[in-house]
Amino acid sequence: MARIAGVDLPRDKRVEIGLTYLFGIGLSRSQEILAETGVNPDTRVRDLTDEEVANLRAYIETNYQIEGDLRRWEAMNIKRLADIGTYRGRRHRQGLPVRGQRTRTNARTRRGRRVTVAGKKKAPSKK
């Protein structure tokens, strides 16, 4: 079982894809890491030797900020924006889109599920 930065990599996937399970490592960065460490990207995670796993772990920990450190850094940046009172910080705090998107319609991902407001009731028809 390959474990890097506290994350178990899926055994049946290729190493190239398995590394993307680490927060902060995407496909291109994964390919870069494998090229630098000399590990074949087509190798399955279960077939990695202990030495290869140790090399990957050492290279990633020395050259990249991943998982908890990256999440903490991101949260601190958002908190800093909110503390200095920027528009972006306010939008983060309110849970609204930060980058200028419209909110009259759409923005469901940021705003959450719809909250239906009862409309005006229809008057009974006269017959």
Swiss-Prot record:
Keywords: Ribonucleoprotein, Ribosomal protein, RNA-binding, rRNA-binding, tRNA-binding. One of its GO terms (cellular component) is small ribosomal subunit. One of its GO terms (molecular function) is structural constituent of ribosome. Gene3D superfamilies: 1.10.8.50, 30s ribosomal protein s13, domain 2. Transmembrane segments: none annotated. Disulfide bonds: none annotated. Residues 90-127 are annotated as: Disordered. One of its GO terms (biological process) is translation. Residues 101-127 have a biased composition (Basic residues). Belongs to the universal ribosomal protein uS13 family. Part of the 30S ribosomal subunit. Forms a loose heterodimer with protein S19. Forms two bridges to the 50S subunit in the 70S ribosome. NCBIfam families: uS13_bact. Located at the top of the head of the 30S subunit, it contacts several helices of the 16S rRNA. In the 70S ribosome it contacts the 23S rRNA (bridge B1a) and protein L5 of the 50S subunit (bridge B1b), connecting the 2 subunits; these bridges are implicated in subunit movement. Contacts the tRNAs in the A and P-sites. This is Small ribosomal subunit protein uS13. It comes from Rippkaea orientalis (strain PCC 8801 / RF-1) (Cyanothece sp. (strain PCC 8801)).
